[in-house]
Amino acid sequence: MAQNLRVAMIGYGFMGKVHSHAWRSVNHFFPDAPNIEMTVICGRSKEALENARMTFGWKESETDWKKVIARDDIDIVDVCTAGDTHEEIAIAALKAGKHVICEK
C-alpha cells in the first residue's frame, strides 16, 4: 500500500491557490510518489477560507494555524502566508515534528 502524506496549508491567497493546484497535481506528474491528502487549509477569514476549501479541494478548514500544527494527522505544513509571518509558523511547525515547505 502506498504511503499517504497529509498536508496542511497555511494561507490561501495567490500562492495558496498556486500551491493548491500543485498539491492536486503531484500524483499525476509523479505516480510513484506517496499519495497526497489535502487535509486542511488555514486562514483568517472563515467565509473566504471555506470558499477556498471548496474551490481547491481541501478536506477541512481552520482559522487557527497553531491548532493545525498541533494536529497529529498532519505530516507537511505548507506556509503560503505573508513573508513577515513565515518564521514563526515554520519554526513552530518544525518544533512540532512536521515537514515544512515555505513560500519565499
What feature does the model see in each segment?
Residues 1-56:
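N-terminal Rossmann-like dinucleotide-binding module
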